[in-house]
Amino acid sequence: QEDLLKQNMMSSLLEKETLLREIHHRVKNNMQIIASLLRLTDFQSGNPEVHDVIRDCRNRIFSMASIHEKLYQTDDLAQVPLGSYIRDIGNRIILEFEMEDGQIHFRVDENQPVFVDISTGIPIGLMMNELITNSIKHAFPDTGNGTIQVQIGRDRDGQSGMIRYHDSGRGLPDGFDPDNQTTLGVELIRNLTTQIQGTVTFESGSGMTCTLTFPLKKTPDSHDTVIGEET
């Protein structure tokens, strides 16, 4: 009877895992359908301003869809590697902007592997989307060429995760104060940082640097650290 109970429990867990995997797959597909509809609207409009707005919306959608795709592909369905996730987002944005090969050098360096759950991954993905988009649009106005580097790690005590984003562009405008900015991108970054109980700072000098810190939690499984809410 005990063996039968264990067998039933395993069967139930497998069914739930299959269902969760299917949910992530369907959410990703539905988001891609929305992005495709936006692209169709873009083609029909022929308006450059509409094109820019729709492209930015599509990139935000893809940043959210990407984490569902990665969760669908993982074994535990709960967390994704942050470095790989950000790398996918950056490469997708550069592709959407139709940059020439090698025009923007984008790299992600991981001091330590860090994993995120979906509740933290989506806000981080959206923030990275805004930063990369802003760099491509505004940081390199003269030549369109530049470097974007993302460094991922933890603080010394291992209690907080850190993302250091840097572009080699012209830097922040004089008098830039993120707390008083009303642009959509800065407001999104500010609100999403609050959502994950993090902090964000901006610096100018040899380009622009944005540093994001956020709380980590320990997990008993094979991954050393996962970022997200306690469950």
Locations of the language-model features?
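Conserved short strand/loop->alpha-helix "switch" segment adjacent to the catalytic nucleotide/phosphoryl-transfer site
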Residues: 8-20, 24, 46, 77-80, ...
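Short acidic helix/loop segment immediately C-terminal to the autophosphorylated histidine
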Residues: 38-52, 75-76
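Amphipathic, heptad-repeat alpha-helical coiled-coil "signal-transmission/dimerization" linkers
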Residues: 1-13, 17-20, 24, 31, ...
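Short beta-strand/loop element within the Bergerat-fold HATPase_c
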Residues: 145-158
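Glycine-rich/acidic phosphate-handling loop/turn and adjacent ATP-lid/helix
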Residues: 158-186
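Short C-terminal beta-strand
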Residues: 151, 164-166, 208-218
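ATP phosphate-binding glycine-rich loop and adjacent ATP-lid/helix-beta elements
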Residues: 175-203, 229-231
